[in-house]
Amino acid sequence: LEAVDKQFHFLFRHKIDTAEELTSYRDDASQRITIISEERKELKNELRRIGIPEQRLEEIKTRIGQISAELRTLRQDVKLCDAIAVRSLEIAEKNAQLKQIEEKEVERKREQERKHGKTHIR
């Protein structure tokens, strides 16, 4: 239930109403992960250089921390998008199964009515 609650709040917070919007959000988040991961990699490489001024070192470390926090959030968002997509497919399958069961029940009732209707006519 907690997972469903998180998914609901995620969809609400990001104003996602359709599967297409969910896919678009996920793709954007994945692309952002790629971009800022590369930025973080470059900053970490810069940290290894000798003779960097102390102020620049602090700026780099601060930015790496910011990127790491953003990456954590984006990765969680991507996981949520994947979980929501799976859940929506499961719900769609269950709805299809339910509809099939209901249709069979309606057909069974019609068949019974036809049988009973024929016996009354004789």
Residue locations for each model-derived region?
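Extended intrinsically disordered terminal tails
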Residues: 1-122
